Amino acid sequence: MSRFTNCIKTARPSAFKTIWWLTKIMVLLSLAIMLLQYIGVIEWISYLLTPIFSHFGLPGEAALAYVSGYFVNCYSAIAVMTTLDLSTRAATILSVMVLCSHNMILETTVQHKTGSPIIKITIIRTLSAFILGWVLNKIMPGSFESSSLTNSIQEELTFAIMLKDWALRTAKNIVLMAVIVYFLTVLQKILTEYGIIEYISRFLKPVMIFFGLSPRCAFLWLVSNTLGLAYGAGIMIEEAEKGETTKEENDLLNMHIGISHSNLEDLLLFTAAGGAYLWMLLSRWCMSLIWVWFFRVTETLSHRDTK
């Protein structure tokens, strides 16, 4: 059997295991969130947050976009953003906040599987969104401006329509997820078998060191930053189970990619919605760098004190 064929064969069990686990999580959590949307819980939380958003230079209506993204995903947030008349400045600030903390329930569940506490990652990502919102409001050119809803048609959806929409959207996401996870698992096996992973780690070593991350996480960092957090989960889980990366290394990586991931599709979508690409990318890289080095320095000092 050729090395290439063997890579495909050995990748199947771990790929299918991850796909099945992600499918269960995606179905259960997305259904629960859809029900919360239907009974009005998401809108109620948005209403409570509305007064806070003036501190981020955003109109009150932006709270609904943020909360929608927080519990659902970026697409949901963008759908609300398109109903608001936002300046580039406001769209950028709101986009950064959503990018830091979107799809929180699903993504923190995935990150927990790789060794990071759900509460810790949730706090870090939520705080990052609020801190960056406040900081960007202070340093970005321009000033606060109110917004108004556009003349988009707001229709009240029945439960049957919402359920059908959820089923179709979830099925599409599961198929896409399955294809990408399987492809990435096979690719990782091939890159490892032919020693290419070592070259990637070596090439990205300066970047990893700058961000405070282990060079052994280079491929995982690359996958998460380009394609997304959930898609790299299968590889990350397998690496952790095999002991290729330590719990501490995974935890630091999770802090970074929790704030900054999917920097191709998601960033382009928010750019199309009015955000400024470089502000959205660099601000989150800075925040993730600060968190990782803060925890590394804190850990070093605590070890020094115990000696």
Model-flagged regions — what are they?
Residues M1-I52, T126-I209, C286, H303, ...:
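Selected transmembrane alpha-helices and immediately adjacent juxtamembrane segments
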Residues S101-L157, E265, F270-R304:
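Transmembrane helix-loop-helix hairpins in multi-pass inner-membrane proteins
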Residues P59-T114, F210-T271:
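Alpha-helical membrane segments and immediately flanking helix-loop junctions
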Residues Y38, T82-R89, S143, G274-A276:
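Helix-coil boundary and interhelical linker segments in multi-pass alpha-helical membrane proteins
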Residues A32-I42, S76-M81, T192, N263-A272, ...:
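Juxtamembrane "helix exit" motif at the C-terminal ends of alpha-helical transmembrane segments
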Residues M34-W44, A63-A77, S116-T126, L168, ...:
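Hydrophobic alpha-helical transmembrane segments
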